[in-house]
Each structure stands twice: as C-alpha cells, then as structure tokens.
C-alpha cells in the first residue's frame, strides 16, 4: 500500500510514508495545542491564577540558591509567624524540573517569562505522550485521534494554558509517560527491554506523584488492573516478576522524596498498589499449583477473601483515611462541614451542564468506544478478530469508569474525565472508521454508493468534531480558553485588564518596610509574598485552618477589637514555640503555649477558640473590591459592587468565622445589613449604600426588598491623615475611573499603632 512506501533508511530503521504522516499529525496537534493555550497573551504576558506565583518563587529560590538549600528552606515570609517547610508542602518535582530546564534552555531569558511558557510547552508535548500510550492500547490510528482530541480538550487546556505554572501540565506529562513505558513494557515479554521500560515507568509515575497530587487518581485503576491481571493473561511467569518490579520500584522511589513519601506508601495510594501486587503474586502461585479445572475456582475464592479482608482493614481504621477531597472523589455525595473547603472555587460540585460543555461530542465517540470494547471482549471469548488485548481493554474501562465517576465530585476533576473520555473516544472513532470502510467495501453494490457512504460518513464525523470548536459563539472551546490572567483582573467576574494588582504590589514593594506583615484574605497571599515581597499570614496552600479562621474573625470584629488583635504580638512568636500544622498535634502544642502550667484543662475546641483570639502583629491591611461604575462623568458617581472581590466573599468570611449570616446579610445572602457596616471589613470598604436599585426598571428605593441591588456612593471612613485605627495609604487606579465600567480596586490601609481607643 502507498502508506508503506519506503522513503529512506536510517541504520536498520526504514522510514516510510506512514511515519511521515504520523509526524505531520502530531506536529499539527502540538501546534494547535500551543496556539489555543497561548491565547491569553492577547491580554498580557503574566502568570495566571494564584499558586503559580508561589511555584515561581520556589523555582527562583532553587535557581539562586541550589537544590540543597531548597530542601532546607523554611520560608518565614508566609504563614507568619509559623513559616512553611517548603519541600514538605510543595510540588517538589515541578520546582526542580523547571529550575533544571531553565539552566539548560533558559538562554538568558527571564525566569518569570520562562515559567509563563512552561505549562504551554509541556501541555502541548503531552499530545505526543498520549499518542504513544493509546497506540499501545489500540494502534496508531487511535493514538493519532487521541493526540488531536487532547490538543483541543477544554478541561485540559483550562488547566494548562499560558501562565498556568501549576502542577497539572507537568504531572500529566509525567504520569502519561510513566503509564506508556509501563504498558509497553508488559505488553510483550522482551526481557531486558521490558525490564528497563518497567523501571522507567515507575520512575516517571513517582515524578508525577511528586509534581502533582492528582496523580493518585491514576493509582486506583492501576491497582484494580493488577487485581484483574491474573485472570486476563496466561504468561504468569512474566507478570509475576514484572508487576512486583514496577510496584517495588514505585514504592522505593516514593520514599526517597519528601513528598509524598510515607504518606503515600502508608495511605490509600500505597495500599492500592501493594495489596493488589501481593494478590497477583499469590494468585499466580495458586494457579501454578492448582489443576487446570480448579485454577479459576481457587483464584476467584482467593479474590473474594482478599476483597473481604480489604474491607475489614478499611473498616478497622488500620489504613488512615485520606483528606476530604480524596474521600469526596470516592463518595461524591459526601457533604463537607468545613466552610473553608467549600469556599474554594475548584471544589464546586460538577453539574451535568458543565460536564456536557467540557466533554461535548467526545461523549458520543466514547460511548461508541465502550460498545466496541465490549464487543471486542465477546470476540476474544469466541476467538474471533479482535483489536485490543484483554488486559489493555480492562485498564481502559477502569480508567474511564473511575475518571468519570471521580469528576462528579469537584469541577477540577473534570481533567480525569476528559483524559478517560479522550482515550475511549479515540478508540471508538478509529474502530468506527475501520468498520465503516470495511463494511462499505464488502456490502456496497457499486462504487458510487461506496464513495457516497464514505464521504457522507466522514463529513458527519468532521462536523460533529468541529461543533465544540466553533459553537456557541464566544463560549466554544477555543474562545472559552481565551481570558486574561487572574492578576490582571483580580479574579473578578469582569473580563477586563486593569493592572490594579501589579500596580498595587509594586507600590507595596517600594513604599513599605521589607519586614512588614500584610493582613489580607488568604486568596492574595501568594501574590503579596511573591510580587510584593512582604510577609503574609495565609495563602492558597491553606496549611493552617485556624489561621484562616482567625483572619475571618478579625475582618468581622468591630474596629477597636480588630485593631487590638492586629497590633498584639503573637504568643507563638514570643515564646518561640514551633507549632505544627497537623490539627491534633498543633492544638496540643498550642495548649502548652496558652496554658503552660496545665491549670485550665480545656479541650481541643476551646483551644482552637483561644488560638483565634491570639495576637497577629500586622502592619498593613489589604482588601480587594470589584464592582461597576454605573454613571458617566456628567453624573454623580454611583456604583454596584458584588464583582468577585472581598465584597462578594464576605459571606464566606462569615461562614468560616462561624457566625450567623442572618446577623450580617439580608435574605439574598449578599446585601449587607447595618451590622456588617460596623465591622472592620465594612468600614474599610470606601463606599456607602445610598439606595437599592431595581434591575428591571432602574428605579431606586430607600429600603431593601428582595431582588433589589444596593447602589453605592464613595465614602472613605479611614482617611490617610486621620487619627483612627487605620489610615488609607493606597488605592489602585481603576477606582478613579470617570466613565461607566468595571473597577477592580486594591485598597491598602496602614495600621495606626498609636491609635487610642475612645472609652
């Protein structure tokens, strides 16, 4: 055939036309992925979201100080006054890999710019890796389809676009590469080649675990695959050493890393690998010593006993429970009683509408893929033609089932559903085309009918695949991935570029003492530390719950009580007691700080309440507001808030602090009551309500009614030259706009240490 036409020879390798076609398709997929992921550059070349700023700062530390210093780094600029052990609480491989590659490929470029492009490059390189993986499963055609689908998949692009210097792009690259090496190693027994691939596969999976915690969601289907393997393959002499080799290497290498280390080995991840591996070894031995007639029966009995034993281990509590987010992934109906967990936007439960928007027509081809896989399984049992071996078939199905199931818990887990559906849909589409062409060749009565069927089918498939890329307008997959970096609009609901945050952080860095402690909501901690170079109390790592709860409490106190707590020294700082972030241990150590003589004998709940009331020793308070000016320059300035800043997050402040929302908010859970305006946060908002507007007719009313929107006018309560507890020292530019349009205002107050309360 033409595709096998030999073009030239390199050594023993014959380069044929089909190889050129593969390179062309992969190059196209890589280029398309790069272009879609880079659309954010139209708004500005910045890191996106929050975590990437910490990752940039950690990478910069390695570049400047070396890897050894990184593993000894206790960051005293965050989580004041406790600090943070960076290597124990971070994605180590992300930082080490980026720093290493920067030294090789940086070529004098700025590290900040290098980290902005890093996720785009590795996210696009993953199209090649998923091609290789799916090719092992179901052939070259399926692999090429998977590469093209991966290049345009919305959930994958959203978590790997320009500036998304987080763990997912590198983690996905590593885990897909590790799985490819593992499955290509066990597909056939090739001796030393299989040995090398299995070892390398385990190594890259460990890299993925260290770079991205989400890799653990790939471990569960892998463990289930190990359980099924003795029933799927007859080459027990091979798998009895190949699988333990992978598992042993994985566990051993995991222990070398500070994270995940023993927490993975002794937790559900390690159990999901170790116990199925032990089962596989014993099951293979049982089959070896059993007669042919009793092999299946004895193996099934042992499987049942193993499952019951596993349930008993879990029920006994011998295996520690994972964190809530992993439990919630296994049980999507599990409700969180932690307001802090619920407040994270990435923890929003996935809706059917979101799933269909993210997966779109891929679901159609994934369903076709499932049908063909089950049909293939039937063919295997009947010794008919098959396109995928039983063991690969089972892993594909396990990954798909677990991926789609887990994605129903959190919206961020749509990433796993997307990868699962991509694999299934690429397999389904490749087999569909193969059967379609074969059937038309065998059944068509004449060439014209053949051609019509082929052309019509290809046209329909192309139209289906094109729909999510072009429809609907402005919210299709291509346009949806085009948005400004979070720091350019503050994470507000407005698709604008104001630059208020970069301006504010540069002002902070230039106009405040280097040892200043900035009190703010935890969302902004990474920005303040990395760009503003100032000390913060909390950030997106959410390491210490009671620290964030304390921040919420202070925001909702009256100005005098808030000022007093903000200016008081922190007892942990005075005593020099190193407190851990582990809740139980941390509370026990705090009891020694708060009650060194053990006279009070209070329990954990009272201890936590007392921690929340301890001093903070801050110097500045930062708040962020987002809203809309609704009048032009010829009219008095009126505003509507609720644009995604602290004015919108106040309901979460209240819940996290444990207060009653009815005390501070109206029935719509947004509009403030008078009690809110007496809090520190309320008084720091430089606006006052002048009435309540009806969006349907633009009328203004004096009293609140449900459905009305508060209308604000400027009103600064803490002027810069005042003698109150706080002094306004900075307001970002957009708040001064004179025309209609959005504002994304960063406001900074200096804490007046000389303030005298009025009795």
Question: Which residues does each predicted region cover?
Answer:
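Hydrophobic/aromatic-rich transmembrane helices and adjacent perimembrane loops
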Residues: 363, 397, 402, 407-441, ...
């Amino acid at each position: 055939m033409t595709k096998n036409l030999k073009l030239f020879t390199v050594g023993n390798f014959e380069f044929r036309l089909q190889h050129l076609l593969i390179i062309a398709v992969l190059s196209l997929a890589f280029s398309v992925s790069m272009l879609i992921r880079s659309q954010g550059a139209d708004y500005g070349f910045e890191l996106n979201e929050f975590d990437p700023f910490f990752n940039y700062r950690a990478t910069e530390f390695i570049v400047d100080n070396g890897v050894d210093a990184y593993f000894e780094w206790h960051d005293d600029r965050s989580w004041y006054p406790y600090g943070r052990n960076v290597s124990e609480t971070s994605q180590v491989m992300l930082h080490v890999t980026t720093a290493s590659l920067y030294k090789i490929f940086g070529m004098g470029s700025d590290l900040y710019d290098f980290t902005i492009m890093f996720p785009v490059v590795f996210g696009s390189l993953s199209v090649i890796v998923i091609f290789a993986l799916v090719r092992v499963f179901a052939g070259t055609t399926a692999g090429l389809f998977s590469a093209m689908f991966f290049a345009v998949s919305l959930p994958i692009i959203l978590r790997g676009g320009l500036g998304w210097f987080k763990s997912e792009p590198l983690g996905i690259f590593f885990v897909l590469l590790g799985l490819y090496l593992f499955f290509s190693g066990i597909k056939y027994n090739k001796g030393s080649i299989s040995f090398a691939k299995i070892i390398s596969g385990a190594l890259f999976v460990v890299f993925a675990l260290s770079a991205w915690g989400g890799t653990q969601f790939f471990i569960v289907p892998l463990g289930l695959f190990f359980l099924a393997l003795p029933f799927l393959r007859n080459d027990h002499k091979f798998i009895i050493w190949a699988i333990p080799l992978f598992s042993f290497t994985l566990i051993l290498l995991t222990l070398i890393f500070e994270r995940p280390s023993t927490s993975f080995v002794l937790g559900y991840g390690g159990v999901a690998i170790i116990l199925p591996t032990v089962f596989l070894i014993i099951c293979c031995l049982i089959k070896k010593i059993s007669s042919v007639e009793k092999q299946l029966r004895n193996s099934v009995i042992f499987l049942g006993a193993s499952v019951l034993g596993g349930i008993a281990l879990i029920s006994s509590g011998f295996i520690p429970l994972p964190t809530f987010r992993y439990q919630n992934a296994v049980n999507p109906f599990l409700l969180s009683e932690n307001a802090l967990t619920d407040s994270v936007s990435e923890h929003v439960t996935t809706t059917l509408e979101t799933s269909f928007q993210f997966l779109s027509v891929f679901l159609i081809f994934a369903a076709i893929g499932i049908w063909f896989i089950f049909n293939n399984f039937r063919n295997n049992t009947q010794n008919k033609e098959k396109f995928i071996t039983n063991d690969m078939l089972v892993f594909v199905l396990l990954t798909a089932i677990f991926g789609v199931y887990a994605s129903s818990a959190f919206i961020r887990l749509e990433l796993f559903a997307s990868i699962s559906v991509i694999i299934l849909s690429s397999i389904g589409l490749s087999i569909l085309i193969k059967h379609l062409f074969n059937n038309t060749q065998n059944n068509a009565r004449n060439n014209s009918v053949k051609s019509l069927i082929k052309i019509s089918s290809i046209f329909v498939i192309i139209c289906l695949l094109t729909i999510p890329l072009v429809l609907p307008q402005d919210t299709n997959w291509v346009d949806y991935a085009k948005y400004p970096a979070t720091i350019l609009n503050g994470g507000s609901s407005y698709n604008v570029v104001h630059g208020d945050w970069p301006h504010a952080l540069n002002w902070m860095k230039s106009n405040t003492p280097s040892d200043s402690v900035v009190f703010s909501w935890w969302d902004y901690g990474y920005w303040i530390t990395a760009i503003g170079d100032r000390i913060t109390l909390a950030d997106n790592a959410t390491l210490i719950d009671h620290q964030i709860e304390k921040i919420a409490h202070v925001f909702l106190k009256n100005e005098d009580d808030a000022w007093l707590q903000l200016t008081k020294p922190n007892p942990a700082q005075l005593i020099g007691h190193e407190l851990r972030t582990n809740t139980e241990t941390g509370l026990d150590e705090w009891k020694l700080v708060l009650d060194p003589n053990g006279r009070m004998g209070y329990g954990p709940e009272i201890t936590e309440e007392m921690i929340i009331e301890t001093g903070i020793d801050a110097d500045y308070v930062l708040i962020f507001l987002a809203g809309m000016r609704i009048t032009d320059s010829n009219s008095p300035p009126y505003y509507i808030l609720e644009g995604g800043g602290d004015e919108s997050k106040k309901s979460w402040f209240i819940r996290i602090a444990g207060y009653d929302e009815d005390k501070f908010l109206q029935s719509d859970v947004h509009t403030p009551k008078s009690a809110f305006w007496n809090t520190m946060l309320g008084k720091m908002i430089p606006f006052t309500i002048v009435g309540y507007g009806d969006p349907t007719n633009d009328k203004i009313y004096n009293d609140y009614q449900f459905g009305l929107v508060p209308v604000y006018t400027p009103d600064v309560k803490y002027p810069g030259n005042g003698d109150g507890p706080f002094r306004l020292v900075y307001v970002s530019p957009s708040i001064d706009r004179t025309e209609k349009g959005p504002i994304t205002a960063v406001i900074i107050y200096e804490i007046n240490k000389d303030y005298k309360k009025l009795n």
